[in-house]
């Protein structure tokens, strides 16, 4: 193609707006009834989205920021590398993420590639990632008591301090992948005491223990409500681990496997 002779298709402002609105609302009409809502597009959330969508479940990820990756982008104190240990390397290999082996079972990964390919893998599997949306509450039902969806609001609306009611998204499973604060589970614990959720809070760093315990404790917190990634450490009172991300992707895969099994037999 000769760049000097390119003829650019002319599209006026009205068409731009109409096309964006039409296809955005098509997506929203579809996701308003989802199989799984994941809150947070960090490593555990995007890994979970990949495996859930790959299994054929309608999966949407709501991310409050205008980017994905969670803590990946910050690397280690803004250095652009992170550590992955086995067996999490198998997940990264599946997503075609390059690994630099530094010792047996330990790898260095470029943080930008890690988050970009995690997101691309989830999207290619069929998950929908929507930025700029905050989940500020859950939907629940009684008899039996369970979480059945979330309330969503534009992050910008909340930042502006405007009083605007949310919209609601139904789901058979809700995953809190919001990180250290476990924001969704914290709201559910406070507003629905009948769920009997106690949140002891995250402990200080102990990487070796934290990685294994985070994966082991990943799963259902209350009927319909699940914890993945750093939300697990907050809810279960586990240590943090710093810029080693094996547990994050393993936790994402584990919560997906648990949800797939739960929905299959529900």
Curated annotation (Swiss-Prot):
Q: Which Pfam families match?
A: Thi4
Chemical reaction(s) catalysed: hydrogen sulfide + glycine + NAD(+) = ADP-5-ethyl-4-methylthiazole-2-carboxylate + nicotinamide + 3 H2O + H(+)
Q: Which GO terms describe its biological process?
A: thiamine biosynthetic process; thiamine diphosphate biosynthetic process; thiazole biosynthetic process
Write down the superkingdom of origin: Archaea
- Which cofactors, if any, are listed as required? Fe(2+)
The pathway it acts in is:
Cofactor biosynthesis; thiamine diphosphate biosynthesis
Coiled coil is among the record's keywords: no
Q: Which Gene3D superfamilies match?
A: FAD/NAD(P)-binding domain
- Which keywords annotate this record? Iron, Metal-binding, NAD, Thiamine biosynthesis, Transferase
Q: What class of enzyme is it?
A: transferase
Which cysteines are cross-linked by disulfides?
A: none
State the EC number(s): 2.4.2.59
NCBIfam families for the chain: sulfide-dependent adenosine diphosphate thiazole synthase (TIGR00292)
Q: Which HAMAP family match?
A: Thi4
Quaternary structure, per UniProt, is:
Homooctamer; tetramer of dimers.
What PANTHER family has UniProt attached to this entry? THIAMINE THIAZOLE SYNTHASE (PTHR43422:SF3)
Described purpose of this protein according to its UniProt entry: Involved in the biosynthesis of the thiazole moiety of thiamine. Catalyzes the conversion of NAD and glycine to adenosine diphosphate 5-(2-hydroxyethyl)-4-methylthiazole-2-carboxylate (ADT), an adenylated thiazole intermediate, using free sulfide as a source of sulfur.
Tell me which family the UniProt entry assigns to this protein.
Answer: Belongs to the THI4 family.
Q: What is this protein called?
A: Thiamine thiazole synthase
Q: Which organism is it from?
A: Sulfurisphaera tokodaii (strain DSM 16993 / JCM 10545 / NBRC 100140 / 7) (Sulfolobus tokodaii)
Lineage of producing organism: Archaea, Thermoproteota, Thermoprotei, Sulfolobales, Sulfolobaceae
């Amino acid at each position: 193609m000769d760049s000097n002779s390119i003829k650019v298709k002319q599209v006026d402002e009205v068409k731009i707006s109409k096309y964006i609105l039409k296809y955005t609302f098509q997506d929203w009409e579809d996701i308003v009834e989802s199989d799984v809502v994941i809150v947070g597009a960090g490593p555990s959330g995007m890994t979970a989205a990949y495996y859930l969508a790959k299994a054929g479940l309608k999966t949407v990820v709501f991310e409050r920021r205008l980017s994905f990756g969670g803590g990946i982008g910050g690397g280690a104190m803004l250095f652009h590398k992170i550590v992955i240990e086995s067996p999490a390397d198998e997940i990264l290999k599946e997503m075609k993420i390059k690994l630099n082996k530094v010792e047996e079972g330990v790898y260095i990964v470029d943080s930008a590639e890690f988050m970009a390919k995690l997101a691309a893998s989830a999207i290619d599997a069929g998950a929908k990632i929507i930025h700029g949306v905050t989940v500020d509450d859950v939907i629940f039902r009684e008899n039996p008591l369970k979480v059945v969806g979330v309330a969503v609001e534009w992050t910008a609306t909340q930042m502006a301090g405007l009083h605007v009611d949310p919209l609601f998204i139904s789901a058979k499973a809700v995953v809190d992948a919001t990180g250290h604060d476990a924001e969704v589970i914290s709201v559910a614990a406070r507003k629905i005491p009948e769920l009997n959720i106690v949140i002891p809070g995250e402990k200080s760093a102990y990487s070796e223990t934290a990685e294994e315990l985070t994966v082991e404790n990943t799963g259902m917190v209350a009927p319909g409500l699940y914890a993945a990634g750093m939300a697990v450490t907050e809810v279960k009172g586990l240590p943090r681990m710093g810029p080693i991300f094996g547990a994050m992707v393993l936790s994402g895969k584990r919560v997906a496997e648990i949800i797939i099994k739960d929905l299959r037999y529900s």
